[in-house]
């Protein structure tokens, strides 16, 4: 990597950030596309977000990614925000504009792109989402924005699912999102659902943990997506595949949220072939063999 006086800087703000694979994504993309750009991480404590964003703008930083715990707090430091990111209430990408930064949520763009490349259509699809955290909220907004037929939002604490359902249904002026206690999954009618697992259950080292351990539930799936990428094959994915259906982990979602941010910063389009090259680098860095 050749860093010069003209090299533009992008980075990740959050805490912790030492484990992040975002530098691998963006520095490989810069090398592949010949952009004079470098990406690193910045540990930012809670309460220091506003000063960090102001400092980044003063230092002529091209763009930032934002990770936990700052995705909501950073909104107050923006001069503009993408409407869907505003509705979700979470921003993970800042793009430099006149006077400051504009916020986007490329987490949902990443999942949308992964689904598109895998041939999974959300429009008119029936969806089941497991979990009701920040990722579930963003994905529920995505499903409704893509005109999913219905979205069952399952969580152990149904109150959290109800809050998301009310927000999404109000935003899109419909009642397609249906909150449900996860214990009542048998009440979901029919089959052929896109099932998206958004919780941390099954994350390494708890590889054999799963939110629902009942073969009957997985018969409802047409396809499964787990946002976890370590392990590469979660128990959730194995249960989907046992029904003869395809299942995907979250590594490509992680990759494509980065690709979407990179495109916003550099006003360019990354081809699927270029993204696939970076995907191989990510697999190598993480020691993942699929």
Question: Which residues make up each language-model segment?
Answer:
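Short helix-loop-beta connector
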Residues: 120-126, 218-220
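Adenosine-phosphate binding glycine-rich loop
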Residues: 223, 227-290
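Phosphate/diphosphate ligand-binding glycine-rich loop within oxidoreductases
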Residues: 2-118
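Rossmann-like adenosine-cofactor binding region
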Residues: 175-247
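Glycine-rich adenosine-cofactor-binding loop
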Residues: 14, 105, 124-145, 155-160
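NAD(P)-binding Rossmann-fold cofactor-contacting core
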Residues: 146-172
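Short beta->alpha hinge that forms the Motif I/post-I loop of the SAM-binding pocket
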Residues: 44, 156-160, 232, 250
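Residues at the starts of beta-strands that form the adenosine-phosphate
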Residues: 9, 38, 126, 149-151, ...
């Amino acid at each position: 990597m050749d860093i010069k006086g003209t090299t533009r800087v992008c980075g990740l703000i959050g805490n912790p950030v030492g484990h992040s694979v975002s530098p691998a994504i963006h520095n490989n993309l810069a090398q592949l596309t010949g952009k004079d750009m470098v990406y690193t991480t910045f540990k930012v404590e809670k309460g220091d977000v506003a000063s960090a964003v102001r400092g980044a703008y003063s230092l002529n930083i091209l763009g930032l990614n934002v990770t936990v715990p700052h995705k909501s707090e950073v909104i107050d430091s923006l001069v503009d925000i993408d409407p869907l990111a505003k509705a979700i209430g979470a921003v993970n990408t800042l793009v430099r504009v006149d006077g400051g930064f504009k916020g986007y949520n490329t987490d949902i763009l990443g999942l949308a792109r992964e689904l598109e490349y895998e041939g999974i259509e959300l429009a008119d699809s029936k969806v089941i989402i497991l979990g009701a955290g920040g990722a579930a909220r963003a994905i529920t907004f995505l499903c409704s924005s893509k005109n999913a037929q219905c979205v069952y939002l399952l969580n152990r604490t149904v109150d959290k699912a109800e809050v998301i359902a009310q927000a999404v249904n109000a935003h899109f002026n419909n009642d397609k999102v249906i909150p449900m206690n996860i214990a009542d999954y048998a009440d979901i009618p029919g089959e052929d659902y896109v099932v998206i697992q958004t919780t941390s259950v099954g994350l390494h080292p708890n590889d054999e943990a799963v939110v629902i351990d009942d073969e009957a539930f997985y018969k409802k799936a047409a396809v499964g997506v787990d946002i976890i990428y370590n392990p590469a094959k979660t128990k959730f994915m194995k249960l989907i595949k046992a029904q003869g259906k395809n299942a995907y982990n979250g590594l490509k979602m992680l990759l494509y949220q980065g690709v979407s941010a990179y495109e916003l910063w550099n006003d360019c389009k990354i081809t699927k072939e270029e993204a696939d090259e970076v995907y191989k680098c990510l697999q190598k860095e993480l020691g993942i063999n699929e």
